[in-house]
Amino acid sequence: MRHHTAFVLSLVATCLLGIMAGFFYAFAIDVAPAMANLDASAYITTQQWINRVVRNATFGATYFGSALLPLAAALAAFWCSQRRVGLAWLAIGLVYFAGVFWLTRTVNVPINDALATWQAASPPSDWAHARDNWNDANLVRTWVAMACFVAAVVLVAVTQGRTR
């Protein structure tokens, strides 16, 4: 039963990491470049709507789950006496936490909070600088999320290959 629980946690963690990597990737390669062509007023209105819509229960569960489930998978692996697997999940979880969750909380969210107060009819003079900083941080979290997803896929494939 322990091994089954550890396996299920590792699969769910991997899926959540993949969903979030895809979410950030789609925004980085499609949405952000499209929005770079908008004037200040259109950009502010669009980004404000995106920020309103993205705050929902489904996204919240996926976003917070992707930060917590790798750590749960690590604990489950340690519980099954799979020290190396546990350490690998711990590394994935910590890298993801720092490069996605922490970065989001310290860079993207403060910019989103400031942007929520802006008036589209009278944008601040530094709106493009804030947009570029947000996009730079999003690009970093995109790469980190993709790397963590790939690491999780490899980890699940390697560990399942050894147990079958």
What is each residue range found by the language model?
Residues 57-73, 131-148:
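Hydrophobic alpha-helical transmembrane segments
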Residues 2-18, 75-99:
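Interfacial segments of alpha-helical transmembrane regions
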Residues 91-113:
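Hydrophobic alpha-helical transmembrane segments of integral membrane proteins
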Residues 8, 17-64, 110-132:
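Interfacial loop at the N-terminal end of multi-pass membrane proteins
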Residues 158-164:
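Short, charged juxtamembrane terminal tails flanking transmembrane helices
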Residues 11, 52, 91, 132, ...:
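Internal alpha-helical transmembrane segments of multi-pass membrane proteins, especially GPCRs
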Residues 18, 71, 98, 150-153:
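Hydrophobic residues within the alpha-helical transmembrane core of Major Facilitator Superfamily
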